């Protein structure tokens, strides 16, 4: 990690962690949180923390336990960003936020990774957020890793095929990742390069890809 073998104390100091708004004592105010963190992180930047608190409109006299979900997330991010991490670990960081706050958070994270020395590892059930933020996406379902691939490669390699149930049976089985037949027709998640020219294909979003992998009939 960061060119070092193992996770050393110095490496830990370069990691910012946000665990779904958890991890901060509910009895503390924002200034009190800053004082606690200053004793934990060797590279804590009090000025940066004060600036993040201002940017996030965190009240000085309100306890963390009285914050809304969005305010809790902002408090956790203020902490995570104020010791100048190289890596942010985010667990369901956008879940439960209203659309405006979530959009603000995504913009902030995109700004963070514009620095080539920064990276984000995020877990989320909000796939649209992953599409905006991530270069590489891994899909876990029931403890199994179904895929781990570059986002652009996923879009280029896979597509949605549309047709009748009869036409579906004529497709090369190696082309079909999963399929779904309804009273209105058939659709399949396919590998573009293995379907015949002239087939009716539409681009597949990452969310559609995940849903078809889980809910569609797997032909493997």
Mark where each language-model region is.
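C-terminal coupling/interaction segments
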Residues: 178-220
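ABC transporter nucleotide-binding domains
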Residues: 1-128, 132-141
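Short, surface-exposed beta-strand/loop "edge" segments at domain boundaries and coil↔beta transitions
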Residues: 88-92, 167-171, 194-198
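ABC transporter nucleotide-binding domain
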Residues: 105-190
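Generic alpha-helical secondary structure signal
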Residues: 9, 47-51, 152, 166, ...
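Short loop/turn segments at beta->alpha junctions
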Residues: 29, 150, 202-205
């Amino acid at each position: 990690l960061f060119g070092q073998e193992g996770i050393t104390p110095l490496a830990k100091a370069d990691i910012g962690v946000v665990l779904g708004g958890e991890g901060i004592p509910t009895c503390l105010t924002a200034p009190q949180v800053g004082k606690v963190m200053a004793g934990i992180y060797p590279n804590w930047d009090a000025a940066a923390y004060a600036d993040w608190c201002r940017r996030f409109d965190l009240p000085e006299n309100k306890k963390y336990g009285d914050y809304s979900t969005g305010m809790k997330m902002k408090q956790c991010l203020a902490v995570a960003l104020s010791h100048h991490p190289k890596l942010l670990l985010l667990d369901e960081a956008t879940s439960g936020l209203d659309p405006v706050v979530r959009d603000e958070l995504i913009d902030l994270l995109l700004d963070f990774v514009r620095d080539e020395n920064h990276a984000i590892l995020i877990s989320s059930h909000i796939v649209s957020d992953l599409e905006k933020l991530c270069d590489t996406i891994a899909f876990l379902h029931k403890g199994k890793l179904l895929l781990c691939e570059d986002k652009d490669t996923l879009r280029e390699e896979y597509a949605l095929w549309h047709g009748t149930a009869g036409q579906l049976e004529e497709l090369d089985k190696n082309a079909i990742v999963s399929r779904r037949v309804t009273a209105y027709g058939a659709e399949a998640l396919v590998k573009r390069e293995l379907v015949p020219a002239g087939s009716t294909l539409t681009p597949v979003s990452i969310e559609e890809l995940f849903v078809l992998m889980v809910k569609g009939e797997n032909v493997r």
